[in-house]
Amino acid sequence: MSFHHIPVLLNEVLEYLNPQPGEVYADGTLGGGGHSEAILQAMGETGTLYGIDRDPAAIAAATERLRVFPGFHAVHGNFHDIKELLPGVQLNGGLLDLGVSSYQLDTPERGFSYHEDAPLDMRMDTTQGMTAADYVNTVSEQEFCRVLREYGDEKWAARIAQILIEKRSEKPLETTKDLVAVVDAAIPKAVRRKDEGHPARRTFQAVRIAVNDELAPLEQALRDWVDMLVPGGRLAVITFHSVEDRIVKLTFRKLQNPCTCPPKAPICTCGKKPLGRAIGGAIKAGKEELDENNRAHSATLRVFEKGT
């Protein structure tokens, strides 16, 4: 299967990043290379772009797609480790498109989709780490309940966690169908019928986030990316659910106003200066894109500009 992935909010990303010839950019979530291709086209032959991804399949596909650009450099790794991956590099701009790619969802054997029966994997980097099967067969009931609530906004978290423990005591969960069966057994049929989306979508999202440790290092990663920007450089971040968006929004707010003095203090004595400003607010896709790309409905873009 080719690595097909429609880049969301592409026009908005280009508008806010405004890449120019000779500049240096990093795409921390390379995926199919759609955003990277547009940035490289805008910069021309003199621009440089580092495309980072945890998924070896994404690296291979994007390298093939972008080989016509002399300034493209593929980097296998996690965007959380940007300072180790690109030591000493200063960026005019950066992009993070968080979440799972269309390719990963559409490749059954990766185990991300609740629509297909496949091994319960969900690793973004298939060369390392525990699988989703490892996780759901060892996690405690209390911890699984917390993960479902915090990462999936799942109202039936306690019941799903209880059923998970019961089911795996009979037989270890091995496939995506096994995990869907847990959700089906936990949520009443009448409630499932009223659900606009698949009832297992929140559970799958929560498990994926836990397996890939997507949120715990996110705030520090955002700080590291901003630190690597040149003055006036911009970081664009696309999120797909409220938990991620909240972290991005609050981190940008802290970077814009890092002062830790008491609220009623007459003057600032902590010495912490603003690192820049958030611009544009929460940017959503327009009607035309929403009509063409269903994934764009849940996408939110936020942009931070480093101070000069």
Which residues are covered by each model-predicted region?
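S-adenosyl-L-methionine-dependent methyltransferase catalytic core, i.e., the SAM/SAH-binding region
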Residues: 1-308
